[in-house]
Regions:
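A short, highly charged nucleic-acid-interacting micro-segment common to nuclease
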Residues: 1-11
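Amphipathic, interaction-prone secondary-structure segments
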Residues: 14-55
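C-terminal basic regulatory modules in eukaryotic proteins
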Residues: 48-88
């Protein structure tokens, strides 16, 4: 069972992207629980589709901010350019 702390972090991240004007269909935030070396590990996967020209300027500061603020087990960000996403 995913902890309330991890769920709260995931919701905050989703709300941050929505506040920045990224539509709901371009954001995916998923929490998963697994076992690693006999202990429970919670992972948050964040996938965001944004315009290609905004990748460097937008993505890097957000990843740095959340990596410093939270010490959850694993926090994965994946930013896809809208050009690449349309080709998939």
């Amino acid at each position: 069972m995913i902890s309330n702390k991890t769920k709260g972090i995931a919701k905050e991240i989703r709300d941050r992207f929505k506040a920045d004007g990224i539509s709901n269909r371009n954001i995916s935030v998923v929490c998963r629980e697994s076992k690693y070396d006999g202990r429970k590990v919670e992972t948050i996967y964040v996938i965001v589709i944004i315009p290609n020209e905004a990748l460097d300027a937008y993505a890097k500061p957000i990843v740095e901010e959340y990596s410093k603020r939270y010490t959850c087990d694993i926090l994965n960000f994946m930013f896809l350019s809208s050009y690449l996403a349309n080709k998939m």
